[in-house]
């Protein structure tokens, strides 16, 4: 069952493990986390625009400990836009994320797809993001508390952050709870298989978007992704389920179903519905 926790504040899920939730979870509105080790702080994801990451960074600073590490769960801008708020931290991510952050920002696409933040993207472009300093290409013990697990599904370079002693996993966008997922660069079938692993990792799962949940919410997401695969290109073929109460269905069902059908046909292409959403139709 998803937890009803406060937003825009550091909420302690377990000893030294905090979550920072943004209300809603729609496009551009993500979550972040903090893990405290003996040597200092590890930040998990950094949100997107200044109005989001500045309060988060201030709250992290108020903990009074050095920020040693910043983990990026994947390359999408709503998770990496605030990296420069932590200038002294080492930045850990997969090679795919590292490559993506070295590319120019597609500002016009951001403004079209996330129009609610259009006025802030020029500032984001001016500030920029930090490059990845340490690539993670497999399972890795980052600190005594933190284990990194590579995966794919939402993107080709997803990263799960497991804090085993707290029974908490930061899943990034491998998990959307109460929010329709977005697979425009993903593989719904592979993603569903990845969730078999993720559902067994911890009792507390912090999604990239939406409220904190657990294995039951992971299984609901898995069922939705499999429904997208089974729809064979027709969003109308997605049957009823827990997803009927999720936000952003109308916009994202076509993207997810089209992407699954394209991949099933051997075509690794951007779904037409996503091209329309970013103004490239």
Residue ranges and their predicted role:
Residues 16, 35, 45, 60, ...:
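Divalent metal-coordination and catalytic microenvironments
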Residues 95-99, 175, 233:
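Short, acidic/turn-prone active-site loops that include or flank metal/cofactor-
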Residues 18-20, 71, 92, 134, ...:
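Hydrophobic/aromatic beta-strand patches that form the interior of the parallel beta-sheet core
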Residues 8-58, 160-172:
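Conserved beta-strand hairpin/beta-sheet module of binuclear metal-dependent hydrolase folds
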Residues 2, 200-204, 212-281:
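Accessory terminal helices/loops
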Residues 50-93, 134, 201-202:
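Active-site metal-binding motif and surrounding structural segment of the metallo-beta-lactamase
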Residues 5, 12, 41-42, 48-50, 99-152, 156-228:
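Metallo-beta-lactamase
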């Amino acid at each position: 069952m998803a937890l009803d926790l406060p937003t825009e504040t550091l909420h302690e899920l377990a000893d030294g493990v905090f979550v920072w939730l943004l209300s809603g979870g729609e496009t551009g509105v993500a979550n972040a986390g903090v893990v405290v080790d003996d040597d200092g702080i590890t930040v998990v994801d950094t949100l997107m625009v200044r109005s989001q990451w500045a309060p988060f960074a201030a709250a992290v600073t108020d903990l009074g400990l050095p920020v040693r590490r910043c983990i990026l769960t994947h390359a999408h801008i709503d998770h990496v836009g605030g990296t420069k708020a932590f200038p002294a931290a080492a930045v850990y991510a997969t090679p795919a994320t590292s490559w993506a952050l070295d590319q120019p920002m597609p500002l016009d696409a951001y403004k079209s797809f996330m129009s609610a933040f259009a006025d802030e993207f020029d500032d984001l472009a001016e500030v920029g993001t930090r490059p990845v300093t340490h690539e993670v290409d497999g399972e890795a013990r980052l600190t005594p508390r933190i284990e990194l697990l590579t995966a794919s599904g939402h993107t080709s370079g997803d990263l799960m952050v497991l804090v085993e002693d707290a029974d908490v996993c930061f899943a990034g966008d491998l998990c959307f709870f109460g929010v329709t997922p977005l697979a425009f660069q993903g593989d719904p079938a592979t993603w569903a298989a990845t969730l078999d692993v993720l559902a067994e990792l911890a009792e507390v799962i912090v999604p990239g978007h939406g409220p904190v949940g657990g294995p039951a919410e992971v299984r609901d997401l898995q069922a939705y992704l499999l429904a997208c695969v089974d729809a064979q290109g027709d969003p109308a073929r997605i049957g009823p389920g827990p997803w009927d109460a999720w936000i952003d269905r109308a916009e994202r069902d076509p993207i997810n179903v089209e992407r699954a059908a394209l991949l099933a046909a051997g075509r690794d292409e951007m779904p037409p519905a996503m091209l329309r959403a970013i103004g490239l139709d």
